[in-house]
Protein backbone atom coordinates (compact mmCIF):
# COMPACT_ATOMS: atom_id res chain seq x y z
CA UNK A 1 0.00 0.00 0.00
CA UNK A 2 1.23 3.47 -0.90
CA UNK A 3 0.07 6.61 0.92
CA UNK A 4 0.59 10.27 0.02
CA UNK A 5 0.92 12.38 3.18
CA UNK A 6 0.55 16.15 2.96
CA UNK A 7 2.33 18.07 5.75
CA UNK A 8 0.63 21.02 7.45
CA UNK A 9 0.66 24.17 5.36
CA UNK A 10 2.71 26.14 7.88
CA UNK A 11 5.60 23.67 7.58
CA UNK A 12 5.95 24.69 3.93
CA UNK A 13 6.35 28.33 5.02
CA UNK A 14 9.48 27.60 7.07
CA UNK A 15 12.99 28.33 5.82
CA UNK A 16 14.49 25.42 3.81
CA UNK A 17 16.58 24.30 6.80
CA UNK A 18 13.70 24.47 9.30
CA UNK A 19 11.34 22.82 6.84
CA UNK A 20 13.75 19.92 6.37
CA UNK A 21 14.08 19.47 10.16
CA UNK A 22 10.32 19.61 10.66
CA UNK A 23 9.69 17.10 7.88
CA UNK A 24 12.31 14.68 9.21
CA UNK A 25 10.72 14.89 12.67
CA UNK A 26 7.34 14.24 11.07
CA UNK A 27 8.76 11.24 9.18
CA UNK A 28 10.10 9.77 12.44
CA UNK A 29 6.75 10.32 14.16
CA UNK A 30 4.92 8.65 11.26
CA UNK A 31 7.29 5.69 11.33
CA UNK A 32 6.86 5.33 15.11
CA UNK A 33 3.07 5.50 14.78
CA UNK A 34 2.69 3.06 11.89
CA UNK A 35 5.47 0.77 13.10
CA UNK A 36 7.34 0.23 9.85
CA UNK A 37 7.37 0.72 6.11
CA UNK A 38 9.41 2.77 3.69
CA UNK A 39 8.99 6.52 3.96
CA UNK A 40 10.54 9.42 2.07
CA UNK A 41 10.12 13.09 1.11
CA UNK A 42 9.11 13.98 -2.43
CA UNK A 43 8.38 17.47 -3.76
CA UNK A 44 6.44 18.85 -0.81
CA UNK A 45 4.72 15.62 0.23
CA UNK A 46 5.75 12.50 2.15
CA UNK A 47 5.29 9.05 0.65
CA UNK A 48 4.70 6.01 2.85
CA UNK A 49 4.90 2.48 1.50
CA UNK A 50 3.77 -0.40 3.71
CA UNK A 51 3.76 -4.07 2.74
CA UNK A 52 0.71 -4.90 4.83
CA UNK A 53 -2.53 -3.75 3.20
CA UNK A 54 -4.16 -4.05 6.63
CA UNK A 55 -1.73 -1.54 8.17
CA UNK A 56 -3.48 0.94 10.44
CA UNK A 57 -3.00 4.02 8.28
CA UNK A 58 -6.04 5.61 9.96
CA UNK A 59 -3.64 6.29 12.86
CA UNK A 60 -2.12 9.00 10.67
CA UNK A 61 -5.18 11.10 11.49
CA UNK A 62 -3.69 11.44 15.00
CA UNK A 63 -0.18 12.48 13.93
CA UNK A 64 0.37 16.21 14.38
CA UNK A 65 1.97 17.90 11.40
CA UNK A 66 -0.23 16.11 8.85
CA UNK A 67 -2.80 18.14 6.93
CA UNK A 68 -4.28 15.17 5.05
CA UNK A 69 -3.37 11.82 3.52
CA UNK A 70 -4.62 9.48 0.81
CA UNK A 71 -4.07 5.80 -0.04
CA UNK A 72 -2.98 5.86 -3.69
CA UNK A 73 -2.28 3.63 -6.68
CA UNK A 74 0.84 4.67 -8.59
CA UNK A 75 2.17 4.01 -12.08
CA UNK A 76 5.56 4.96 -13.45
CA UNK A 77 4.25 6.80 -16.49
CA UNK A 78 3.24 10.32 -17.41
CA UNK A 79 1.79 9.36 -20.77
CA UNK A 80 -1.73 10.76 -21.11
CA UNK A 81 -3.14 7.59 -22.70
CA UNK A 82 -1.68 5.45 -19.91
CA UNK A 83 -3.15 7.79 -17.32
CA UNK A 84 -6.64 7.72 -18.87
CA UNK A 85 -6.62 3.91 -19.24
CA UNK A 86 -5.46 3.42 -15.64
CA UNK A 87 -8.08 5.87 -14.35
CA UNK A 88 -10.77 3.89 -16.16
CA UNK A 89 -9.45 0.60 -14.74
CA UNK A 90 -9.34 1.90 -11.15
CA UNK A 91 -12.41 4.12 -10.94
CA UNK A 92 -15.07 2.69 -13.29
CA UNK A 93 -16.64 0.68 -10.48
CA UNK A 94 -16.27 3.53 -7.96
CA UNK A 95 -18.22 6.06 -10.08
CA UNK A 96 -20.87 3.53 -11.09
CA UNK A 97 -24.31 5.09 -10.66
CA UNK A 98 -22.86 8.21 -9.02
CA UNK A 99 -22.26 11.84 -9.93
CA UNK A 100 -18.52 12.47 -10.06
CA UNK A 101 -15.77 14.99 -10.79
CA UNK A 102 -12.12 14.56 -11.76
CA UNK A 103 -9.46 16.77 -10.14
CA UNK A 104 -5.99 16.75 -11.70
CA UNK A 105 -2.72 18.26 -10.50
CA UNK A 106 0.71 18.28 -12.15
CA UNK A 107 4.28 18.92 -11.04
CA UNK A 108 6.91 19.02 -13.76
CA UNK A 109 6.90 19.49 -17.52
CA UNK A 110 4.33 17.58 -19.59
CA UNK A 111 2.88 17.76 -23.09
CA UNK A 112 -0.64 18.24 -21.69
CA UNK A 113 -2.39 20.39 -19.09
CA UNK A 114 -4.21 19.42 -15.90
CA UNK A 115 -7.45 20.34 -17.66
CA UNK A 116 -6.62 17.88 -20.44
CA UNK A 117 -6.29 15.12 -17.85
CA UNK A 118 -9.61 16.03 -16.24
CA UNK A 119 -11.44 16.08 -19.57
CA UNK A 120 -10.00 12.85 -20.93
CA UNK A 121 -10.39 10.89 -17.69
CA UNK A 122 -13.90 12.31 -17.25
CA UNK A 123 -14.88 11.22 -20.76
CA UNK A 124 -13.56 7.70 -20.09
CA UNK A 125 -15.49 7.37 -16.82
CA UNK A 126 -18.69 9.13 -17.86
CA UNK A 127 -20.44 6.05 -19.38
CA UNK A 128 -20.21 4.25 -16.02
CA UNK A 129 -21.55 7.15 -13.97
CA UNK A 130 -24.78 8.98 -13.27
CA UNK A 131 -23.24 12.21 -14.55
CA UNK A 132 -20.70 14.94 -13.83
CA UNK A 133 -21.02 17.83 -11.38
CA UNK A 134 -17.87 19.81 -10.70
CA UNK A 135 -19.46 21.77 -7.84
CA UNK A 136 -21.23 19.08 -5.79
CA UNK A 137 -20.07 15.61 -6.87
CA UNK A 138 -20.85 12.47 -4.89
CA UNK A 139 -17.40 11.11 -5.71
CA UNK A 140 -14.19 13.00 -6.43
CA UNK A 141 -11.47 11.32 -8.49
CA UNK A 142 -7.96 12.69 -7.97
CA UNK A 143 -5.05 12.28 -10.38
CA UNK A 144 -1.62 13.70 -9.52
CA UNK A 145 1.19 13.66 -12.08
CA UNK A 146 4.56 14.24 -10.42
CA UNK A 147 7.23 14.29 -13.12
CA UNK A 148 7.33 10.70 -14.44
CA UNK A 149 5.01 9.25 -11.76
CA UNK A 150 1.21 9.35 -11.64
CA UNK A 151 -0.89 8.79 -8.52
CA UNK A 152 -4.61 7.92 -8.43
CA UNK A 153 -6.91 8.19 -5.39
CA UNK A 154 -10.45 9.05 -4.36
CA UNK A 155 -10.14 9.54 -0.60
CA UNK A 156 -8.65 12.53 1.22
CA UNK A 157 -8.49 11.83 4.96
CA UNK A 158 -7.99 14.83 7.23
CA UNK A 159 -5.05 15.00 9.62
CA UNK A 160 -4.91 17.11 12.80
CA UNK A 161 -2.53 19.70 11.25
CA UNK A 162 -0.32 21.55 13.74
CA UNK A 163 3.40 20.82 14.09
CA UNK A 164 5.20 17.49 14.59
CA UNK A 165 5.61 16.58 18.26
CA UNK A 166 9.23 17.21 19.20
CA UNK A 167 10.06 20.30 17.15
CA UNK A 168 9.23 22.76 19.96
CA UNK A 169 11.05 21.11 22.87
CA UNK A 170 9.70 19.99 26.24
CA UNK A 171 7.12 21.53 28.54
CA UNK A 172 6.18 20.50 32.10
CA UNK A 173 2.40 20.11 32.28
CA UNK A 174 0.52 20.52 35.55
CA UNK A 175 -1.85 17.63 34.94
CA UNK A 176 -4.72 17.33 37.42
CA UNK A 177 -6.64 14.83 35.32
CA UNK A 178 -9.78 16.97 35.16
CA UNK A 179 -11.35 17.99 31.87
CA UNK A 180 -9.01 20.93 31.24
CA UNK A 181 -5.45 19.67 31.70
CA UNK A 182 -5.63 16.81 29.13
CA UNK A 183 -6.96 19.29 26.55
CA UNK A 184 -4.17 21.77 27.36
CA UNK A 185 -1.64 18.94 26.99
CA UNK A 186 -3.11 17.97 23.62
CA UNK A 187 -2.99 21.57 22.39
CA UNK A 188 0.68 21.94 23.35
CA UNK A 189 1.45 18.66 21.57
CA UNK A 190 -0.28 20.11 18.52
CA UNK A 191 2.25 22.95 18.60
CA UNK A 192 5.15 20.49 18.63
CA UNK A 193 5.85 20.19 22.38
CA UNK A 194 6.76 16.99 24.19
CA UNK A 195 4.84 17.04 27.50
CA UNK A 196 6.44 16.04 30.79
CA UNK A 197 3.54 15.27 33.09
CA UNK A 198 3.50 16.46 36.70
CA UNK A 199 0.52 15.12 38.63
CA UNK A 200 -0.27 15.80 42.28
CA UNK A 201 -2.17 12.70 43.36
CA UNK A 202 -4.80 14.03 45.74
CA UNK A 203 -7.21 11.11 45.43
CA UNK A 204 -5.26 7.88 45.87
CA UNK A 205 -5.45 4.87 43.56
CA UNK A 206 -8.60 6.00 41.70
CA UNK A 207 -7.00 9.34 40.83
CA UNK A 208 -3.85 7.63 39.55
CA UNK A 209 -5.83 5.06 37.54
CA UNK A 210 -7.94 7.68 35.76
CA UNK A 211 -4.94 9.93 35.06
CA UNK A 212 -3.09 7.03 33.44
CA UNK A 213 -6.15 6.21 31.32
CA UNK A 214 -6.27 9.80 30.10
CA UNK A 215 -2.56 9.76 29.32
CA UNK A 216 -2.93 6.52 27.37
CA UNK A 217 -5.49 8.33 25.21
CA UNK A 218 -3.07 11.25 24.72
CA UNK A 219 -0.24 8.83 23.93
CA UNK A 220 -1.97 8.09 20.61
CA UNK A 221 -1.28 11.70 19.59
CA UNK A 222 2.37 11.75 20.68
CA UNK A 223 3.94 10.59 17.42
CA UNK A 224 5.59 7.73 19.25
CA UNK A 225 7.28 9.94 21.86
CA UNK A 226 7.33 8.47 25.35
CA UNK A 227 5.28 10.28 27.97
CA UNK A 228 7.20 10.70 31.23
CA UNK A 229 4.97 11.10 34.27
CA UNK A 230 5.92 12.31 37.76
CA UNK A 231 3.22 11.47 40.31
CA UNK A 232 3.55 13.39 43.56
CA UNK A 233 1.91 12.20 46.77
CA UNK A 234 -0.47 15.07 47.37
CA UNK A 235 -1.44 14.21 50.95
CA UNK A 236 1.95 15.42 52.20
CA UNK A 237 1.29 18.78 50.56
CA UNK A 238 -2.18 18.93 52.13
CA UNK A 239 -0.70 18.47 55.59
CA UNK A 240 1.59 21.44 54.98
CA UNK A 241 -1.28 23.58 53.70
CA UNK A 242 -3.35 22.93 56.83
CA UNK A 243 -1.16 25.59 58.47
CA UNK A 244 -2.54 28.23 56.07
CA UNK A 245 -5.83 30.13 56.40
CA UNK A 246 -8.50 28.09 54.66
CA UNK A 247 -9.46 30.79 52.14
CA UNK A 248 -5.87 31.00 50.85
CA UNK A 249 -5.24 27.28 50.46
CA UNK A 250 -6.25 26.97 46.80
CA UNK A 251 -3.79 29.62 45.63
CA UNK A 252 -1.12 28.28 47.98
CA UNK A 253 -1.61 24.80 46.52
CA UNK A 254 -1.22 26.24 43.03
CA UNK A 255 1.97 28.00 44.16
CA UNK A 256 3.37 24.68 45.40
CA UNK A 257 2.50 23.08 42.06
CA UNK A 258 4.10 25.90 40.06
CA UNK A 259 7.28 25.85 42.15
CA UNK A 260 7.53 22.07 41.84
CA UNK A 261 7.04 22.37 38.08
CA UNK A 262 9.81 24.99 38.02
CA UNK A 263 12.16 22.55 39.75
CA UNK A 264 11.16 19.79 37.31
CA UNK A 265 11.95 22.10 34.38
CA UNK A 266 15.47 22.46 35.74
CA UNK A 267 15.88 18.70 36.05
CA UNK A 268 14.48 17.77 32.63
CA UNK A 269 15.68 20.74 30.55
CA UNK A 270 12.09 21.71 29.79
CA UNK A 271 11.73 25.36 28.82
CA UNK A 272 8.16 26.10 29.90
CA UNK A 273 5.27 25.20 32.19
CA UNK A 274 1.79 24.43 30.83
CA UNK A 275 -1.50 24.56 32.74
CA UNK A 276 -5.16 24.01 31.90
CA UNK A 277 -6.26 27.31 33.42
CA UNK A 278 -8.98 29.37 31.73
CA UNK A 279 -9.44 33.01 32.68
CA UNK A 280 -12.07 33.53 35.42
CA UNK A 281 -13.35 29.95 35.20
CA UNK A 282 -12.93 29.53 38.99
CA UNK A 283 -11.76 31.78 41.82
CA UNK A 284 -8.11 30.70 41.58
CA UNK A 285 -8.09 31.61 37.87
CA UNK A 286 -9.00 35.29 38.11
CA UNK A 287 -6.42 37.60 36.60
CA UNK A 288 -5.42 38.81 40.07
CA UNK A 289 -4.88 35.28 41.39
CA UNK A 290 -3.03 34.12 38.28
CA UNK A 291 -0.64 37.02 38.86
CA UNK A 292 -0.06 35.90 42.44
CA UNK A 293 0.20 32.23 41.49
CA UNK A 294 2.93 32.70 38.90
CA UNK A 295 4.84 35.49 40.67
CA UNK A 296 8.59 34.85 40.57
CA UNK A 297 8.41 31.74 38.38
CA UNK A 298 11.33 32.00 35.95
CA UNK A 299 9.91 29.82 33.16
CA UNK A 300 7.22 30.97 30.71
CA UNK A 301 3.78 29.66 31.62
CA UNK A 302 1.55 28.61 28.73
CA UNK A 303 -2.22 28.47 29.19
CA UNK A 304 -3.61 27.26 25.85
CA UNK A 305 -7.18 27.33 27.20
CA UNK A 306 -7.05 30.88 28.57
CA UNK A 307 -9.78 32.19 26.24
CA UNK A 308 -11.92 29.04 25.98
CA UNK A 309 -15.23 28.52 27.72
CA UNK A 310 -16.09 25.18 29.32
CA UNK A 311 -18.28 24.02 26.45
CA UNK A 312 -15.46 24.51 23.95
CA UNK A 313 -13.03 22.64 26.20
CA UNK A 314 -15.48 19.75 26.64
CA UNK A 315 -15.92 19.48 22.86
CA UNK A 316 -12.17 18.98 22.41
CA UNK A 317 -12.01 16.55 25.35
CA UNK A 318 -14.69 14.42 23.68
CA UNK A 319 -12.86 14.54 20.36
CA UNK A 320 -9.53 13.36 21.81
CA UNK A 321 -11.10 10.68 23.99
CA UNK A 322 -10.21 11.96 27.47
CA UNK A 323 -13.63 13.27 28.53
CA UNK A 324 -15.06 9.88 29.51
CA UNK A 325 -12.27 9.47 32.07
CA UNK A 326 -12.10 13.11 33.21
CA UNK A 327 -15.74 13.25 34.33
CA UNK A 328 -15.13 10.39 36.76
CA UNK A 329 -12.47 12.38 38.58
CA UNK A 330 -13.55 14.60 41.50
CA UNK A 331 -12.17 18.16 41.65
CA UNK A 332 -9.45 17.52 44.21
CA UNK A 333 -8.00 21.02 43.88
CA UNK A 334 -11.20 22.49 45.35
CA UNK A 335 -9.84 22.36 48.90
CA UNK A 336 -11.68 25.49 50.03
CA UNK A 337 -15.29 26.51 49.44
CA UNK A 338 -14.56 30.17 50.30
CA UNK A 339 -11.51 30.92 48.20
CA UNK A 340 -10.66 34.58 47.59
CA UNK A 341 -10.81 35.95 44.05
CA UNK A 342 -7.89 38.30 44.77
CA UNK A 343 -5.18 37.07 47.11
CA UNK A 344 -2.69 39.43 48.71
CA UNK A 345 0.74 38.71 47.21
CA UNK A 346 2.72 39.70 50.30
CA UNK A 347 0.58 37.47 52.51
CA UNK A 348 1.02 34.52 50.14
CA UNK A 349 4.80 35.03 50.02
CA UNK A 350 4.95 35.17 53.84
CA UNK A 351 2.98 31.92 54.05
CA UNK A 352 5.30 30.37 51.50
CA UNK A 353 8.37 31.35 53.51
CA UNK A 354 6.81 30.02 56.71
CA UNK A 355 5.86 26.65 55.15
CA UNK A 356 9.37 26.22 53.71
CA UNK A 357 8.34 23.48 51.24
CA UNK A 358 11.21 21.32 49.96
CA UNK A 359 10.42 21.08 46.23
CA UNK A 360 13.50 18.98 45.56
CA UNK A 361 12.28 16.42 48.08
CA UNK A 362 8.78 16.43 46.57
CA UNK A 363 10.27 15.31 43.25
CA UNK A 364 12.66 12.82 44.86
CA UNK A 365 9.68 11.11 46.51
CA UNK A 366 7.53 11.13 43.37
CA UNK A 367 6.66 8.01 41.38
CA UNK A 368 8.04 8.11 37.83
CA UNK A 369 6.20 6.24 35.05
CA UNK A 370 6.84 6.08 31.30
CA UNK A 371 4.14 5.33 28.75
Curated annotation (Swiss-Prot):
This protein's name: Probable tRNA sulfurtransferase
Gene name tied to this protein: thiI
EC numbers on record: 2.8.1.4
Signal peptide feature range: none
Subcellular location: Cytoplasm
Pathway annotation from the record: Cofactor biosynthesis; thiamine diphosphate biosynthesis
Residue positions binding ATP: 174-175, 199-200, 254, 276, 285
Function: Catalyzes the ATP-dependent transfer of a sulfur to tRNA to produce 4-thiouridine in position 8 of tRNAs, which functions as a near-UV photosensor. Also catalyzes the transfer of sulfur to the sulfur carrier protein ThiS, forming ThiS-thiocarboxylate. This is a step in the synthesis of thiazole, in the thiamine biosynthesis pathway. The sulfur is donated as persulfide by IscS.
GO molecular function list: ATP binding; CCA tRNA nucleotidyltransferase activity; tRNA binding; tRNA-uracil-4 sulfurtransferase activity
GO CC annotations, alphabetized: cytosol
Amino acid sequence: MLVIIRPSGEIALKSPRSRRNFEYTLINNIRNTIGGGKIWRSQGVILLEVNDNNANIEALSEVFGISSFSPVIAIKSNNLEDIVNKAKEIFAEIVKGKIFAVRAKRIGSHSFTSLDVERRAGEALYPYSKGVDLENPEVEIFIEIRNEMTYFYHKVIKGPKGLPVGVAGKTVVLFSGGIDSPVATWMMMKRGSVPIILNFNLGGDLHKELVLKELNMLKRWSGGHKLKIFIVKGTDVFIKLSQVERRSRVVMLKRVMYKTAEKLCEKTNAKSITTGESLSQVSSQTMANLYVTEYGIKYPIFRPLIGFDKEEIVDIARKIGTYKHSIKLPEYCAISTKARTSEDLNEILKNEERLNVDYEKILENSEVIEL
